């Protein structure tokens, strides 16, 4: 029996080490690829070759590595009071930046959330799902939890008199709270996981956390990928609490073991609730449950092995035990029971919530919902993301059985048409698109904003290259820390016979996420639910270096490392200066197209017909120069149409800025107008885009493209109205339009370029001198 137990444990350990080795290989390849995988930096990609792109991204990664070291040298010498002040000021700056993006820039997530907001608002106000959102919620019933959350927020907004036009602020405020709570929980998790963390180390981690640009850009990402973050991190924090052994501080403080056990079961129930709700909100939460179960089984098996040997082992396992085998046995039973309670509660809460939300939404999705195999089938089309053709194919079948049969047949056809090399290329593309970029798709999903002045151009517009580099450098910094942690975990597991089961749980979640998106629909945004886990693993991988140095007192090695850090900073400063000189003409004197959006609304789901005697008017706010207007329409009569429309862009007072005619004759069903005119400096007050029929048969009407979703108007700075014979009817919709300034000029001015390069050079230089000065203080025993 003893030999069977040993063999079983060896098999489990071998499988775990093998999985971590595969995860290391995947992340290492992503790390290498990441140095040239940031194509959203369009200006840099327009002239830079692969080596230059790799060097620029390498500078970004090196910046965060040096910053991590420099902050450690500074904060380790600070008093507690200073550290607290730094934390408070940093938190205030973070909140200020979040408020700027939340309340001023006001970008918005373009896709699914609109249907959910409209459906939730109609449920609250009419008791049924709006027609505009019905298809989406009938096809994707997995969004019902998202609908419930949104409905609660709509009710809260109605209570405080918040109208449909500004509801997005309420939703995004809630989204920001979710982001900040997840950051707080991640920091608390690290403190509980790495118990020897000192105050200055926690402060350093917090400051590096604040360098993550998603904390600011993501405030408007009202979607399940962000709303699920606090649920996931709360679950993982409670899981770590459950796995802690009884005793310790509680016994020292006179607390009874029974009270600790009851609290443990309470945590298990709460963790199960978070996992169940998280699963209903986003199905990838099942990966957390599977990882917790797998790691828990291994942990309990290793603990049982140790107890069976009566404590007389030659191997060391990092399990909760003391010198009393009976107590160890009791501890193992407690943890097994609490893990079982956790999983049972997750199932109960998930099933209960699922039933409640189905009853609330009130849509029979038996035949309309897509089968799970649909996403497997759809992801077999390069590049492995969502595509409308496969969605239309699945939706065209009436019943559940027909959908499953048709999807299975189409999946088989796709697989038979693919060679092994094609499939491997698809897998590589899906993994790269999901876990290979640090932007999380924000240039696609969040680029549309209400305000396009201020920092918009540098973050979302044609000058976003530096911010893209910042994203990619920070993400590769995270991957570097994770790779270091995997190496340390593997070394401890194989050589020292020590297993960090909690770290293994986090790694197993990432491993499961990679496998999941090999099979499922892939997208850059789908790595967001795992962002905080990656942060925790990164800092866990970086922390042991500092702790080992100080605990061992290896000051000679410290001095050498500080010197290396300083010289790396000096080298980076030199590269920045040389690159700045070499690319001066390219950046400051080479003309290129520099489009700048002034007011934009690109969501569309229907069209609004404009009959004889009617005028469709969209009011907009323009605060920057503009010279281009774009609108779209539908022409049901197509080539035979006789309709002629007048299109005007005018001030609210009536002064016409631009006017043209739209002739529908000889055109197809889908039409668009791109109109250029002399650059106009905006006047005070609002502007209007007006469409009016001036001739043609009564039956030949154009229908202008709009976004009409009950309770959700994506363009909140104006209203859409339909006027006829002096009467104006306000529509709960937004016209699809774009007003922009198209200009040809250099990327930036010489003055701005010199200032930017000089600042970057001085920052690297300062960090290098700081590290060098700290070497002197270490050698002189002044720390």
Q: What is each of the regions a protein language model found here?
A:
Residues 129, 358-450:
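Membrane-proximal stem/loop segments at transmembrane-domain junctions that anchor or position
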Residues 206, 267-282, 293, 514:
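Membrane-interface alpha helices of multi-pass inner-membrane proteins
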Residues 114-139, 145, 384-389:
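Extracytosolic helix-loop segments that constitute the early lumenal/periplasmic catalytic or substrate-binding loops
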Residues 119, 135-165, 173-176:
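Short hydrophobic/aromatic helix or loop-helix immediately within or flanking a transmembrane segment
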Residues 1-99, 326, 331-345, 563-569, ...:
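Start-transfer (signal-anchor) and selected internal transmembrane alpha helices
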């Amino acid at each position: 029996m003893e030999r069977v137990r040993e063999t079983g444990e060896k098999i489990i350990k071998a499988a775990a080490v093998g999985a971590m080795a595969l995860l290391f290989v995947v992340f290492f390849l992503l790390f290498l690829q990441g140095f040239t995988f940031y194509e959203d930096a369009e200006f840099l990609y327009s002239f830079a070759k692969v080596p230059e792109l790799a060097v620029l991204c390498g500078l970004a990664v090196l910046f965060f590595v040096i910053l991590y070291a420099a902050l450690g040298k500074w904060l380790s010498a600070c008093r507690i009071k200073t550290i607290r002040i730094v934390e408070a000021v940093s938190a205030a700056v973070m909140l200020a930046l979040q408020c700027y993006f939340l309340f001023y820039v006001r970008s918005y997530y373009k896709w699914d959330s609109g249907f959910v907001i409209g459906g939730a608002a109609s449920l609250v106000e009419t008791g049924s799902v709006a027609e505009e959102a019905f298809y989406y919620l009938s096809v994707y019933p997995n969004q019902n939890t998202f609908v419930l959350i949104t409905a609660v927020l709509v009710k809260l907004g109605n209570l405080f008199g918040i109208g449909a036009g500004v509801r997005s602020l309420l939703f995004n405020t809630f989204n920001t709270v979710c982001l900040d709570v997840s950051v707080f929980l991640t920091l608390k998790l690290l403190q509980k996981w790495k118990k020897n963390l000192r105050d200055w180390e926690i402060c350093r981690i917090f400051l590096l956390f604040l360098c993550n640009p998603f904390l600011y850009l993501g405030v408007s990402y009202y979607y399940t990928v962000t709303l699920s973050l606090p649920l996931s991190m709360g679950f993982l924090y409670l899981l770590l609490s459950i796995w802690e052994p009884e005793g310790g501080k509680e016994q020292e403080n006179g607390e009874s073991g029974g009270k600790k056990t009851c609290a443990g079961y309470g945590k298990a129930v709460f963790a199960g609730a978070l996992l169940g709700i998280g699963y209903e909100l986003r199905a990838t939460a099942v990966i957390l449950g599977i990882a917790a179960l797998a790691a828990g089984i291994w942990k309990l098996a290793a603990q049982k092995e140790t107890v069976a040997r009566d404590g007389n082992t030659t191997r060391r396992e990092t399990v909760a035990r003391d010198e009393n085998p009976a107590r160890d046995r009791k501890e193992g039973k407690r943890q097994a029971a609490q893990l079982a309670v956790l999983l049972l509660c997750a199932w109960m809460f998930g099933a209960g919530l699922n039933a409640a939300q189905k009853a609330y939404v009130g849509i029979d999705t038996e035949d309309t919902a897509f089968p799970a195999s649909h996403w497997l089938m759809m992801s077999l089309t390069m590049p492995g993301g969502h595509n409308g053709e496969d969605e239309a194919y699945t939706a065209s079948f009436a019943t559940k059985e027909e959908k499953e049969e048709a999807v299975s047949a189409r999946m088989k056809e796709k697989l038979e048409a693919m060679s092994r090399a094609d499939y491997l290329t698809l897998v590589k593309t899906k993994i790269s698109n999901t876990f290979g970029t640090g932007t999380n798709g924000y240039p696609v999903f969040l680029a549309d904003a209400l305000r396009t002045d201020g920092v918009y151009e540098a973050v979302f517009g044609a000058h976003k290259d530096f911010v893209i580099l910042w994203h990619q450098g920070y993400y590769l910094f995270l991957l570097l820390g994770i790779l270091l942690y995997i190496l340390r975990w593997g070394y401890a597991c194989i050589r020292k016979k020590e297993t960090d089961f909690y770290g293994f749980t986090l790694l197993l979640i990432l491993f499961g996420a990679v496998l999941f998106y090999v099979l499922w629909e892939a997208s850059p945004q789908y790595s967001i639910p795992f962002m905080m886990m990656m942060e925790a693993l990164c800092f866990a991988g970086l922390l042991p270096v500092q702790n080992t140095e100080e605990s061992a007192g290896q000051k000679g090695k410290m001095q050498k490392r500080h010197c290396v850090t300083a010289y790396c900073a000096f080298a980076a400063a030199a590269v920045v200066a040389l690159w700045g000189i070499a690319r001066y003409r390219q950046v400051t004197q080479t003309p290129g197209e520099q489009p700048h959006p002034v007011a934009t609304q690109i969501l569309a789901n229907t069209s609004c017909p404009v009959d004889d005697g009617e005028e469709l008017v969209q009011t907009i706010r323009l605060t920057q120069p503009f010279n281009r207007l774009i609108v779209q329409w539908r022409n049901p009569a197509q080539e035979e149409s006789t309709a002629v429309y007048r299109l005007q862009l005018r001030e609210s007072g009536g002064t016409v800025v631009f006017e043209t005619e739209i002739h529908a004759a000889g055109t197809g069903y889908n039409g668009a107008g791109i109109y250029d005119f002399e650059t106009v400096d905006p006047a005070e007050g609002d502007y209007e885009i007006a469409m009016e029929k001036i001739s043609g048969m009564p039956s030949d009407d154009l229908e202008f493209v709009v976004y009409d979703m009950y309770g959700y108007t994506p363009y909140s700075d104006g209203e859409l109205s339909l006027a006829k014979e002096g009467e104006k009817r306000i529509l709960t919709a937004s016209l699809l339009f774009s007003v922009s300034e198209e200009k040809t000029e250099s990327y930036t001015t010489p003055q701005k370029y010199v200032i930017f390069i000089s600042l970057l050079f001085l920052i690297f230089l300062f960090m290098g001198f700081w590290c060098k000065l700290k070497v002197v203080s270490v050698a002189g025993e002044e720390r």
